[in-house]
Amino acid sequence: MIFYILFFFGIIKSQENYSYQKPPPEILELVDITLPPRVLIDENKNFMIYLYRNSYKSIDELSSPEIKLAGLRLNPNSNSRSRTNYYNNILISKMDQIDKSAKQIKGLPKNPKLANIKWSPDQTKIAMTNTKEEGVELWYIDLEKLTAKKLTGPKLNASLGDVITWYQDSKNILTKFKLKNSPDIIDGVDVVPTGPIISSNDGKKAQNRTYQDLLKNEVDEKNFETLARSVLSKVSLKGKTKLLAKKNLYHEIDFSPDGKFILISIIQKPFSYLVPYYRFPMKYAIYSSKGKELTVLHEVPLIEDLPKGFMAVRTGPRNFSWRSDRPSNLIFVEALDGGNPETDIKYRDEIFEVGYPFKQNKVSLLKTINRFYRIDWCNDTLALGYDYWWNSRNTKTYIFSPSNTNKEPKIIIDRNYQDRYNDPGSFVKRRNFYGKSILAMNKQNLYLMGDGFRDDGQFPFIDQLNLESLKKVRLYESSFKDKKEDLLDFEADNNMILTRIESASEYPNYFFRDLKTDSLTKITDFENPFLSIMDVSKEVIEYKRSDGIDLSATLYLPKGYDINKKQKLPMIMWAYPREFKDNKSASQITQNKNEFTFPYWGSPIYWLTRGYVVLDDVSFPIIGEGDNQPNDNFRKQLVDNASSAINRVYELGYIDKEKVAIGGHSYGAFMVANLLSHSKLFAAGIARSGAYNRTLTPFGFQSEERNYWEAPDTYYNMSPFMHAEKVKTPLLLIHGEEDNNSGTYPLQSERYFNALKGLGATTRLVMLPKESHSYRAKESIMHMLWEQDRWLERYVKNK
């Protein structure tokens, strides 16, 4: 009887049932706010669009019908993505008028759920979708008239790829529609099996990541076809609809710059149970603007067996796209190394151009030493090509002449893309006659906008690059030391910069900066909604690891903290490990103390209101120079990063060293579990949505491209699950029940919790219903904050 009572109460204690809870008022005040809108500005700076949405979804919204197919999550009732973020209001400001105040759009739907916002080519209109329970509607807004109009009923198919695409005339929209007589969705639970599910392999190596939400059986295949199949129709702004192309599994849709042709990708069979839909067989074809198929460019087979490595690609033509500075010239890439990164060859990729009829007389434009990345077009005599190689972190920029293939391309930038201090920036673009993005060139000059990270701070800049001498002249460099400036656009013709400026306590606002007069014109006036943390202390601290690597972090002290008395407070650290191939890049400071203090849903900043010191964005580099792999020395570097950070804040006199917590999300959660397994630095840990057993991700994870059988010791040593018996520190595990991130499926937290519990650790597992890898519902987020606060109060502050 005594055994029964103890057993019964053991079950009660181990399995608690709670309704959704709310965090303390100090935290709740920062969560329950309305954020300023997202801002869009047209190329000519005539219109500013304010897009409003709720800060969070509700658990009711998140509980809408959902079916998981081929890597997608779809709402079968509305035939759309089930986890889309929607806007609920739109305001417009006409920036070329005296009255620049934001005006309400007339005629918007009731209780709008707006998405797929698309500028028209002439940038006087925007198209969008409105999602209702029974389907998705097509709407558009006339920006001059400030009016919205519904063009179709709830007939669109918004499940896959491009849903709406403007015609070049800005008067018609190419739209995906549901089939009129589409089959009903099959409920697989009630289907009687006709046989086993069989997967086989003919001896080829097929090493794939642990993708989720894949097809599992024939019922899934049929449901995928039902929800993904659509017809293409032309919809005029008067609401007239004309069928353009018959039913198919249309994916991506892209008009040629002159609007005469359409590049379309179409998913084919056979489907796969191993990889998501975007690696299914795919047909690339050219259609006329009237919907006639003209040319099949290439039929890509099922991609299940790529060579090993992050730089592996398939063979055959890939990366089909239109050349943005020409009417209808098609670009594609082919691997010269068979797609295999281990092949030793001078050039990895070759880029080709082909014109109508798109099947003959292809012209080679460029060969890249690394894997092709993209091309920025300008004109017949100038384009910039980019490549990159993950293993060395190298990227190159090539200048070449598209019309003169005899002219040797020249490498003008050759750098480590993780080296932020020497980042030359990105080339400025502009819209051309076709409404496409091309390089902004003025009198043989191009322009670069850079973030401007240096060892003494962040100072964004604009450089002018002369194409003949390849010499640079600095046109502008931010001089702010008490604010953060982000350069968004530059018009060389009138020396005008569109910029965004913020400070730790000032919400980001948009400005025009006139370089001629060195003046600023404010164009938005958003206020800080987080008043309770407006006056907290914030600084970027610098310190060294035991091996001499320079580290940094953002340190926050609670409002009213007396810097002279230096009361020793509890601290919460939050971090995310990152891999580097050189010490120099790993040591660079990329935090900015003037960045606006924004407590997003997963932030530790909330605990400033609860009397904690917060150390956020803590440097956690994992370095492997030369032939050394970063992860082969993962644990030692991890502990060294953590102890160095704690010691620095302790030396400053702010914290009780015995009352420090560590937290992280995803790979940061993996970090937390490892630190609690291999150090005694912390009073408690919070690990959200992590992976803890690397044998369950045997073909690579994060930045590890070796498989388990190539590096078994590394996989074992890095897996907290294998060292669960060492955890003596209280650990709070939180996970979304519907996590679809590769490698972090909920089983990871469930099995790790069971191991910790079985070994006598102090631990708690919170599974959030309906949540994926990032949490969306307000109820879930509030409960998460409540759980974290209780954990910190019990095991850290009141230790």
Task: Enumerate the predicted regions with their spans.
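Bacterial Sec-dependent N-terminal signal peptides
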Residues: M1-E16, E737
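Beta-propeller folds
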Residues: Y4, S14-D518, D525-D535, D550, ...
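Active-site-proximal cap/loop segments of hydrolase catalytic domains
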Residues: Y86-L91, Q588-K799
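Conserved hydrophobic/aromatic pocket- or pore-lining residues that grip, position, or stack substrates
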Residues: Y284, L330, I412, Y510, ...
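N-terminal cap/lid segment of alpha/beta-hydrolase-fold proteins
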Residues: T524-Q567
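Short beta-strand element of the alpha/beta-hydrolase
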Residues: K566-R578
